């Protein structure tokens, strides 16, 4: 039996299917942001979205609320994880550029710079001897 209706469960199922396809396409579009386990979560999103799309009309209202809350938190954490991965990659590339710039500065400025003066003696400690006075 196949019965579908346009309700909150169908909309939630379509949303999960779209998020699952987005995670799958992310590996092709931005491979430096995607991880290997995103494919697994993409499959889970497609499966749950399909179940909600085709069988969502059977859900009790409290189960539907539970599915909406779980799907909402899942989508939030997916978005946050992708945002942090993208920023981490940007920071790493920026650090590489800064380190390369520092190496070039040290190479060209300080390469021929030599200190001509040498330390003859290093006196940073002075010993003080105490003797007991005899009365």
From Swiss-Prot:
One of its GO terms (cellular component) is chloroplast. It is found in: Plastid, Chloroplast. Pfam families: Ycf66_N. Keywords: Chloroplast, Plastid. Belongs to the ycf66 family. This is Uncharacterized protein ycf66. It comes from Marchantia polymorpha.
């Amino acid at each position: 039996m196949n019965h579908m209706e346009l309700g909150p469960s169908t909309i939630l199922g379509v949303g999960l299917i779209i998020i699952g396809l987005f995670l799958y396409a992310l590996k092709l579009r931005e491979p430096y942001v995607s991880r290997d386990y995103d494919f697994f979560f993409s499959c889970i999103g497609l499966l749950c979205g399909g179940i909600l799309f085709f069988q969502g009309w059977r859900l009790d209202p409290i189960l539907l609320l539970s599915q909406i809350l779980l799907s909402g938190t899942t989508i939030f954490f997916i978005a946050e994880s992708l945002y942090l991965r993208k920023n981490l990659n940007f920071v790493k590339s920026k650090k590489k550029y800064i380190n390369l710039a520092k190496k070039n500065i040290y190479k060209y400025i300080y390469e021929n710079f030599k200190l001509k003066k040498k330390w003859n003696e290093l006196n940073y400690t002075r010993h003080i001897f105490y003797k007991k006075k005899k009365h």
